[in-house]
């Protein structure tokens, strides 16, 4: 993919940084890259790409809001040395003041979640053409977007395939650089990348230089899912009070670490905090209201787990608003995230050039926390609902039953 500027009256691209992490095959990065007249190509290679663009959006310049948006198409970890963990679905965090429809309040800011890309939720901040661009990106990319005083940083993540030459070039109006790397060493503490860093002249778009580089940094996340035996299941039979079972029987306590499960629940479910006791619970957790009486998207909760055992979290379903679509069930889904978090002696949030900022449950931990991903599984439950076309019959039957009961009681009393 060659570098193309994103220009509009409502947003202007200022900088572009493309990072390519190639799969290792015994050859150096220099052997895999071709430079032809200032255009860098990477033929017959596979790997991962972080495509970062910094844009200026004038309509946001006077607003103090900080906004962090992420979008992930699947529930797998997909953690790489150039991509931190992005939770499944569509997540927004903001410190905006005032109320925002469907957002829930937490001590650190307002939060919104959906398992589909909700472009309508972005219209409060962004011009329509920018939202349309993000919607197109969401079809084939994972996204991580931050907004600070008019500057919007858009990070797109996708795979490099060996049938794509992946040309990289400069432009006349955008400051452009590219990094092409592969992993030298990687463990739970440090990551080392080596390769080439290329820059282009702003104004002419001509290649300035490509130079060899090597650097070390600390990652805030490590993927332990392939080494773990942590399963996420629904206890059978599944009913209106589904029980999520988190199997940590193969895990043992770790010094300075705790195991956790994080839930983004849609409003069709709630947690009884006196039954399943969460460490944190924000959002809609009223025990009686039906889903259509709630204003927020649902709730978020964090549970501390016990290693060496099967942990259970009991959910409760709400009454679903009747519809006339002919279906007796409504499909509701949620995706629990299981991980363990450890205290370290350094501020990890400032140690990686690829880290974009706190997402999801990270907001509730200190900057010196290291996260280890264990599992994230999408769960779907069919909830019963009434057919609204039968409302009159149901109301008449209910009224008749009430009248019969009253008459029966009167007869027994007198």
Curated annotation (Swiss-Prot):
Arranged from A to Z, the UniProt key words for this protein are: Endoplasmic reticulum, Glycoprotein, GPI-anchor biosynthesis, Membrane, Transmembrane, Transmembrane helix
This chain is glycosylated at: 44, 95, 169, 375
Transmembrane regions: 391-410
Q: Name one GO biological process term.
A: GPI anchor biosynthetic process
Q: Which GO terms describe its molecular function?
A: mannosyltransferase activity
Q: Which InterPro entries match?
A: Pbn1, PIG-X/PBN1
Main localization, broad class: endoplasmic reticulum
The UniProt entry, under Pfam families, shows: PIG-X
Q: Where in the cell is it found?
A: Endoplasmic reticulum membrane
What cystine pairs are annotated? none
- For side Cytoplasmic, which residue ranges? 411-414
Q: Which domain of life is it from?
A: Eukaryota
Q: Which GO terms describe its cellular component?
A: endoplasmic reticulum membrane; glycosylphosphatidylinositol-mannosyltransferase I complex
- Listed pathway(s): Glycolipid biosynthesis; glycosylphosphatidylinositol-anchor biosynthesis
Q: Membrane topology type, per the record?
A: Single-pass type III membrane protein
Q: What does this protein do?
A: Required for proper folding and/or the stability of a subset of proteins in the endoplasmic reticulum. Component of glycosylphosphatidylinositol-mannosyltransferase 1 which transfers the first of the 4 mannoses in the GPI-anchor precursors during GPI-anchor biosynthesis. Probably acts by stabilizing the mannosyltransferase GPI14.
Quote the protein name from its UniProt record: Protein PBN1
Q: Which organism is it from?
A: Kluyveromyces lactis (strain ATCC 8585 / CBS 2359 / DSM 70799 / NBRC 1267 / NRRL Y-1140 / WM37) (Yeast)
What does the organism's lineage look like at the top? Eukaryota, Fungi, Dikarya, Ascomycota, Saccharomycotina
């Amino acid at each position: 993919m060659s570098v193309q500027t994103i220009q509009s009256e409502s947003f202007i691209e200022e900088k572009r940084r493309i990072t390519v992490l190639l799969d290792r095959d015994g050859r150096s990065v220099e052997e895999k890259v071709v430079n032809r007249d200032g255009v860098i190509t990477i033929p017959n290679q596979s790997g991962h790409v972080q495509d970062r663009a910094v844009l200026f959006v004038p309509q946001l310049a006077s607003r103090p809001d900080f906004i962090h948006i992420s979008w992930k198409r699947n529930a797998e970890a997909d953690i790489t040395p150039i991509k931190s963990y992005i939770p499944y679905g569509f997540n927004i965090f903001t410190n905006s003041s005032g109320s925002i429809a469907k957002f829930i309040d937490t001590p650190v800011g307002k939060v919104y979640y959906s398992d589909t890309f909700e472009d309508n939720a972005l219209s409060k901040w962004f011009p329509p053409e920018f939202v349309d661009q993000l919607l197109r990106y969401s079809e084939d990319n994972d996204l991580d977007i931050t907004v600070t005083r008019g500057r919007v940083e858009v990070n797109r993540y996708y795979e490099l395939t060996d049938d794509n030459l992946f040309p990289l070039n400069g432009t006349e109006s955008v400051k452009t650089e590219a990094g092409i790397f592969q992993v030298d060493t990687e463990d739970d503490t440090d990551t080392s990348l080596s390769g080439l860093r290329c820059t282009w002249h702003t104004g002419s778009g001509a290649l300035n230089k490509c130079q060899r580089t090597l650097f070390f940094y600390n990652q805030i996340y490590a993927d332990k899912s392939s080494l773990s035996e942590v399963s996420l299941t629904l206890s059978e039979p599944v009913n209106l009070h589904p029980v999520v079972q988190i199997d940590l029987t193969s895990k043992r306590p770790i010094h300075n670490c705790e195991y956790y499960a994080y839930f983004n629940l849609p409003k069709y479910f709630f947690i009884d905090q006196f039954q399943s006791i969460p460490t944190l619970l924000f959002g809609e957790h009223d025990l009686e209201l039906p889903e259509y009486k709630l204003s927020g998207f649902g709730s978020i909760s964090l549970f501390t787990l016990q290693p060496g055992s099967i942990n259970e979290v009991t959910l409760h379903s709400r009454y679903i608003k009747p519809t006339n679509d002919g279906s007796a069930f409504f499909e509701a889904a949620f995706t629990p995230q299981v991980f363990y978090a450890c205290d370290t002696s350094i501020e990890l949030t400032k140690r990686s050039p690829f880290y974009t900022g706190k997402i999801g449950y990270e907001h509730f931990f200190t900057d010196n926390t290291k996260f280890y991903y264990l599992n994230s599984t999408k769960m779907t439950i069919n909830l019963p609902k009434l057919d609204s076309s039968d409302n009159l019959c149901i109301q008449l039957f209910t009224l008749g039953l009430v009248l019969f009961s009253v008459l029966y009681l009167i007869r027994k009393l007198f």
